[in-house]
């Protein structure tokens, strides 16, 4: 079938398998052209491995450090008449390119919050890898079924303690509009912490440790975003921020557990990028459109692969890591450069419907958004007939 982008709200409901493969290849080429990661990981588990930062971590470990990788994700395969999810095609492409390099790559499809998927992962590590020396936690999910209670909990994107009104960008209608959000209830805050906080990361590390599949010296990191003043009301000081603060608490006990075997645990702070998750946050499209313009002008613009490759090379496995006073690894320092933030803040209230394309890089934002789904990739013929039924040879599908 011939597949064209169809966007509804902050989701593109179609995906392009050839475009997704080309996007993965571009990221691999970036890593291989920038050289190996010295003393990098060799056997890596990535939880949330199919898109965005998790996919970039899997690519960086495999092609920057020659690592065998096991990826966990929750994606949907395509059929002859309907495309699958982008994460499915990304993972199929990753496994194909890893196999060409002689690297081990297997994937587990299922609910990473569940005990079942944790057990299947442990069994696969024991059978295929023995032990892992890096665990990357990169889950973004709107809800979680708690494995112990069976309760399904939802996360909420709301301010805490006060209603907030801010400028946003309606990406469908391409207009600037005021957005007002009522404060989260305590139940909504607790739910967001349960879905997006550190409990599941801790459950993973506890399960892996008890099963004896963490190598001596094993490291783990969970990805987070802090942002700057302009996003704080809705992000760091909001319900999501409460979940992110929970990561900062949970990492301490995880670090103690791994330190007993010479290992380490860190929260890693990454810059704002276009992802399916960030495009759902009302103020992020406008912030990102301004940020892209400023960072491209200063030559510091980065996407997922540049961020995560740099994180592994400089901080997780580098001699002089970028660490803040909380002990987090920082890869967001170019975004938080005061000169960059001052320019974004200065333009924030000046953007109008009429000057949107001149004052911001909304065009670049839209391109990055479509690239998530395999569109707008250079060299791909989007008028060609493609088969959306793409297999992942090494898949262990717990959903069937």
Swiss-Prot record:
InterPro entries for this protein: Eno_Rdtase_FAD-bd_dom (IPR024906), Enoyl-CoA_Rdtase_cat_dom (IPR024910), FabV-like_NADH_b (IPR050048), Trans-2-enoyl-CoA_reductase (IPR010758)
Keywords: Fatty acid biosynthesis, Fatty acid metabolism, Lipid biosynthesis, Lipid metabolism, NAD, Oxidoreductase
MF terms in GO: enoyl-[acyl-carrier-protein] reductase (NADH) activity; NAD binding; trans-2-enoyl-CoA reductase (NADH) activity
Active site: 235
UniProt enzyme class: oxidoreductase
Highest taxon of source: Bacteria
Binding site for substrate: 225
Disulfide bonds: none
Binding site for NAD(+): 48-53, 74-75, 111-112, 139-140, 244, 273-275
Catalytic activity: a 2,3-saturated acyl-[ACP] + NAD(+) = a (2E)-enoyl-[ACP] + NADH + H(+)
Pathway: Lipid metabolism; fatty acid biosynthesis
Annotated positions for site Plays an important role in discriminating NADH against NADPH: 75
One Pfam family it belongs to: Eno-Rase_NADH_b
EC number from the UniProt entry: 1.3.1.9
Biological process (GO), any one: fatty acid biosynthetic process
Family of the protein in this entry: Belongs to the TER reductase family.
Known role: Involved in the final reduction of the elongation cycle of fatty acid synthesis (FAS II). Catalyzes the reduction of a carbon-carbon double bond in an enoyl moiety that is covalently linked to an acyl carrier protein (ACP).
Oligomeric form and interacting partners: Monomer.
Entries under HAMAP family matching the protein: FabV_reductase
Record's protein name: Enoyl-[acyl-carrier-protein] reductase [NADH]
Phylogenetic placement of the source organism: Bacteria, Pseudomonadati, Pseudomonadota, Betaproteobacteria, Burkholderiales
């Amino acid at each position: 079938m011939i597949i064209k982008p169809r966007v509804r709200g902050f989701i593109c409901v179609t995906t392009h398998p050839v475009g997704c493969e080309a996007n993965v290849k571009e990221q691999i080429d970036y890593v291989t052209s920038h050289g190996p990661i010295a003393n990098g990981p060799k056997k890596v588990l990535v939880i949330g491995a199919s898109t965005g930062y998790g996919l970039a971590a899997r690519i960086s470990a495999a092609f920057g450090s020659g690592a065998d990788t096991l990826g966990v994700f929750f994606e949907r395969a395509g059929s002859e008449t309907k495309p699958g999810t982008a994460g499915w095609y990304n993972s199929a492409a990753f496994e194909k390119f890893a196999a060409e390099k002689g690297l081990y790559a297997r994937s587990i499809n299922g609910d990473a919050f569940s005990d079942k998927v944790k057990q299947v992962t442990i069994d696969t590590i024991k059978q295929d890898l023995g032990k892992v020396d890096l665990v990357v936690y990169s889950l973004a999910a709107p809800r979680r079924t708690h494995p112990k209670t069976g309760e399904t909990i939802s996360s909420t994107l709301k301010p805490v303690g006060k209603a907030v009104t801010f400028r946003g960008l309606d990406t469908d209608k391409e207009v600037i509009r005021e957005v007002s959000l009522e404060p989260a209830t305590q139940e909504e805050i607790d739910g967001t912490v349960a879905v997006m906080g550190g409990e599941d990361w801790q459950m993973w590390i506890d399960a892996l440790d008890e099963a004896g599949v963490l190598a001596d010296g094993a490291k783990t990191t969970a990805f987070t975003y802090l942002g700057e003043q302009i996003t704080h009301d809705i992000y760091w000081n909001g319900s999501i921020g409460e979940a992110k603060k929970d990561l900062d608490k949970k990492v301490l006990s995880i670090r103690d557990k791994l330190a007993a075997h010479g290992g380490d645990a860190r929260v890693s702070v990454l810059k704002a990028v276009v992802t399916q998750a960030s495009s759902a946050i009302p103020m992020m499209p406008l912030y990102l459109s301004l940020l892209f313009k400023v960072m491209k002008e200063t030559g510091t613009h980065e996407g997922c692969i540049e961020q995560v490759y740099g994180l592994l090379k400089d901080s997780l496995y580098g001699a002089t890591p970028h660490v803040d006073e909380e002990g987090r690894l920082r890869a967001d320092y170019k975004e938080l450069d005061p000169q960059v933030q001052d320019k974004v803040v200065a333009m924030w209230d000046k953007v109008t419907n009429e000057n949107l394309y001149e004052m911001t890089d909304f065009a670049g934002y839209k391109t990055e958004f479509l690239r998530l789904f395999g569109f707008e990739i250079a060299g791909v013929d989007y008028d060609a007939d493609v088969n959306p039924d793409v297999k992942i040879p090494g898949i262990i599908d717990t959903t069937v």
